[in-house]
């Protein structure tokens, strides 16, 4: 999936593995402060991180939001998701489409990565429901693995040592902002975007990003 982003980023100065600790402005421009002390200057900023993380960066930089902006961002909420990935010793037994949405139980979605053509060996990805993820968030990986595999009822066994558990606290928006982006008021150009703005999933995130790009270009007096 990152192939699209890589293609769009050709020719850009892209920094990876750079943890941002705060966002600071002086009324005219922004300073992005990294955890290692590096400071990057910017005329404007677009953020697509989950809103709680964006708010934490702004708070760390001493940025005060207007009441309207604070209320709009506080209204956005997310569901968590615990994901399990595992390699099997044979076929999963899922249908030809390679994905199943169970009607009940702890599993929200199962995908056969081999049938989808993204794995050379039999392998599955299991997403737990928001409720299971919430209640079992701090449970040991072994307990989560047992519960999800029991519910999955796969035809083949999991290869020892192949299970990976991932926890996404802000996996998907449960309450979205009604517009494609939100430009913060009374500060240098700063646009919030992402899958929580005007439509979840990949399509919504892409549309939000395109709208945010136009908004920041306009705010900076450039042609989008």
Question: What residues fall within each predicted segment?
Answer:
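Short beta-strand to alpha-helix junction loop
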Residues: 1-7, 15, 138-147
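A conserved short coil-to-beta-strand element within the FAD-binding core of flavoproteins
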Residues: 16-31
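Glycine-centered tight beta-turn/hairpin loop motif at sheet-sheet or coil-to-beta transitions
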Residues: 35-37
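Central helical "cap/lid" subdomain
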Residues: 39-96, 158
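Active-site-proximal substrate-binding core of FAD-dependent oxidoreductases
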Residues: 74, 215-224
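Active-site substrate-recognition segment that forms the wall
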Residues: 85-136, 143, 147-155
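Short FAD-binding loop at a beta-strand-to-alpha-helix junction that anchors the flavin cofactor
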Residues: 124, 180-213
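Flavin (FAD/FMN) cofactor-binding core of flavoprotein oxidoreductases
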Residues: 146, 151-188
């Amino acid at each position: 999936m990152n192939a699209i982003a890589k293609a769009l980023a050709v020719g850009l100065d892209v920094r990876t593995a750079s943890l941002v600790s705060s966002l600071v402005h002086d009324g005219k421009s922004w300073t992005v402060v990294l955890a290692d002390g590096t400071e990057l200057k910017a005329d404007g900023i677009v953020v697509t991180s989950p809103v709680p993380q964006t708010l934490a960066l702004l708070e760390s930089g001493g940025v005060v939001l207007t009441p309207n902006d604070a209320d709009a961002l506080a209204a956005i909420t997310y569901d968590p998701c615990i994901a399990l990935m595992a390699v099997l010793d044979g076929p999963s037994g899922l249908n030809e489409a390679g994905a199943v949405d169970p009607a009940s139980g702890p599993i929200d979605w199962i995908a056969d990565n081999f049938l989808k053509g993204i794995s050379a060996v039999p392998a599955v990805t299991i997403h737990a429901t928001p409720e299971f993820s919430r209640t079992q968030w701090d449970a040991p990986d072994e307990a989560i693995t047992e519960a999800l595999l029991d519910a999955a009822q796969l035809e083949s066994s999991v290869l020892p040592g192949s299970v990976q558990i991932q926890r996404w606290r802000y996996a998907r928006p449960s309450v979205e902002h009604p517009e494609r982006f939100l430009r913060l008021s009374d500060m240098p150009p700063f646009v919030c975007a992402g899958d929580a703005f005007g439509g979840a999933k990949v399509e919504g995130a892409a549309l939000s990003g395109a709208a945010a790009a136009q908004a920041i270009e306009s705010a900076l007096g450039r042609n989008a």
